[in-house]
């Protein structure tokens, strides 16, 4: 009887230990075919620890990489697997699916180009997002969908949430490129590769791809429909733009979180930001 009790106790301990060490999974070389971009598009995905053992649907975070990286950046350098698993285990974040698209193949960036020849943003909203939310068990409603990203991807998360506030409950730009800070700067930047673009076309493109311009034109209700978390290091070369966005949101009395911590434009900074991002967006997932 003592031997039997000993075996039962050990099996129970082993079962409990295994349940606590259950981890999520990442896949970093997945792909889909895009008609809009006429190419195969790579993406990576994090599935939470209980995804394979349940039939439930999950909230989703679209997590955008920066310039020079691809869909593997947040996995290799951002340590998304260990950070997300730890946040879920600590109950600071809800189990969620994290999707990381590649925006570095063909042309770099998350937007349509000024001539409309490379339509990445159209691809994202018309093909990629519907494909992901059909392929995986995702709660496909605004309140269960968030977007975040770093640097170029921070700019993408700003613009996507400002272009489509009806789709995202939270937006978390980290060290974001907010777009040219003036029309003159935009002319210098865009004219280098688009010398035949007239002033009206250029100004319209600038207004649609500049966070400050979009904040000034969107209604208060539209801006308030998204929960904003903005984070940028005090030594980051993109600090000025993020600070101006913070001021613009304050002037319109838009609730938002603004973090300025000691740090620069680095993975060390972004890895430290990610747990707070996951907690912030989880609050939005839970508030309903």
Give the residues covered by each predicted segment.
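Positively charged n-region of N-terminal signal peptides that target proteins for export
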Residues: 1-5
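General helical structural elements
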Residues: 6-8, 45
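Bacterial N-terminal signal peptides
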Residues: 9-17
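Non-catalytic cap/lid and distal C-terminal segments of serine-dependent acyl enzymes
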Residues: 22-288
């Amino acid at each position: 009887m003592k031997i039997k009790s000993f075996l039962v106790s050990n099996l129970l301990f082993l079962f409990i230990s295994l349940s606590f060490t259950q981890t999520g999974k990442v896949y970093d070389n997945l792909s889909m075919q895009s008609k809009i971009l006429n190419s195969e598009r790579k993406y990576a995905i994090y599935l939470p620890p209980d995804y394979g053992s349940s039939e439930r649907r999950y909230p989703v975070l679209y997590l955008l990489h920066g310039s020079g990286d691809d869909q593997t950046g947040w996995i290799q350098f951002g340590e998304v697997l260990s950070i997300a698993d730890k946040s879920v285990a600590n109950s600071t974040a809800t189990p969620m699916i994290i999707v990381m698209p590649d925006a570095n193949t063909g042309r770099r960036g998350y937007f349509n180009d000024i001539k409309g020849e490379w339509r990445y943003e159209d691809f994202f909203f018309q093909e990629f997002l519907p494909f992901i939310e059909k392929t995986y068990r995702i709660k496909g409603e605004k309140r269960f969908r968030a977007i975040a990203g770093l640097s170029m991807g921070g700019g993408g998360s700003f613009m996507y949430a400002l272009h489509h506030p009806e789709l995202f409950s939270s937006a978390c730009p980290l060290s974001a490129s907010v777009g040219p800070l003036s029309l003159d700067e935009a002319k210098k930047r865009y004219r280098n590769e688009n010398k035949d673009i007239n002033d009206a076309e250029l100004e319209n493109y600038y207004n649609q791809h500049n966070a400050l311009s979009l904040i000034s034109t969107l209604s208060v209700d539209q801006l308030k429909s998204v929960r904003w978390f903005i984070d940028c290091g005090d030594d980051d070369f993109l600090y000025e733009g993020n600070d101006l966005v913070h001021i613009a949101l304050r002037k319109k009395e838009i609730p938002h979180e603004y973090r300025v911590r000691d740090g620069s434009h680095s993975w060390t900074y972004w890895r430290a930001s990610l747990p707070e991002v996951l907690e912030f967006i989880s609050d939005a997932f839970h508030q309903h």
